[in-house]
């Protein structure tokens, strides 16, 4: 049961003809008239009035909840907008991240290319048939540079 229905039931249950039966009504008004038809007519008039009041209250309750829902929706939308990023800001941030990643990737790619060239040069020195005693100092220098590089990391 929703809030609207709960409020409607609460108000409807508070109406006079809901609270007292015809018998109780008759007992309360017997001192004013003993004509049961007159009492029945009065009670029916009260029931008709309660039905009109119920109908009017139902319309007012519906309108109240429509207005309340509308206000809450506007409030939630404004709160959401105040705490969210615009699509443009998000796209700009993603482009900046992309640029940073591209720069870092280029640095890594350049380092890999440099090391690949050094290894290719080393391989050529080792496989060279002319690599004799005069190539050994160059090889030792390259090996020492790799040892230094490994010790730094």
Curated annotation (Swiss-Prot):
UniProt xrefs under InterPro entries: Nkp2/Cnl2
Record-linked PANTHER family: INNER KINETOCHORE SUBUNIT NKP2
Positions in coiled-coil regions: 86-128
Subunit-structure text: Component of the inner kinetochore constitutive centromere-associated network (CCAN) (also known as central kinetochore CTF19 complex in yeast), which is composed of at least AME1, CHL4, CNN1, CTF3, CTF19, IML3, MCM16, MCM21, MCM22, MHF1, MHF2, MIF2, NKP1, NKP2, OKP1 and WIP1. NKP1 interacts directly with OKP1 and AME1.
Cellular-component GO terms for this entry: kinetochore; Mis6-Sim4 complex; nucleus
Top-level lineage group: Eukaryota
Annotated compartments: Nucleus; Chromosome, Centromere, Kinetochore
Additional observations: Present with 1630 molecules/cell in log phase SD medium.
Keyword flag Metal-binding: no
Main location: nucleus
Family the entry assigns: Belongs to the NKP2 family.
Protein name stated in the entry: Inner kinetochore subunit NKP2
Purpose: Component of the kinetochore, a multiprotein complex that assembles on centromeric DNA and attaches chromosomes to spindle microtubules, mediating chromosome segregation and sister chromatid segregation during meiosis and mitosis. Component of the inner kinetochore constitutive centromere-associated network (CCAN), which serves as a structural platform for outer kinetochore assembly.
GO terms under biological process: attachment of spindle microtubules to kinetochore; cell division; chromosome segregation; meiotic cell cycle
Keywords on record: Cell cycle, Cell division, Centromere, Chromosome, Coiled coil, Kinetochore, Meiosis, Mitosis, Nucleus
